[in-house]
Amino acid sequence: MKRTYQPRNRKRRNKHGFRERMSTKNGRKVLSARRAKGRHSLSVSSAMGTAGQ
């Protein structure tokens, strides 16, 4: 049986990336919570850097 998680970087960026988070009110809430907590990476795309673009 095929597994459910078939990773794709583009899909990962588009669904969980910084711009996607910024596009909704709740997404911005997520980012501010992660900033307040002092997370090293705020979102998937910010963690990927130049290699992911």
Curated annotation (Swiss-Prot):
GO terms for biological process: translation. It comes from the Bacteria. The keyword ATP-binding does not apply. Keywords: Ribonucleoprotein, Ribosomal protein. The keyword Protein biosynthesis does not apply. GO terms for molecular function: structural constituent of ribosome. Belongs to the bacterial ribosomal protein bL34 family. HAMAP family: Ribosomal_bL34 (MF_00391). This is Large ribosomal subunit protein bL34. It comes from Pelodictyon phaeoclathratiforme (strain DSM 5477 / BU-1). The lineage of its organism: Bacteria, Pseudomonadati, Chlorobiota, Chlorobiia, Chlorobiales. The gene is rpmH.
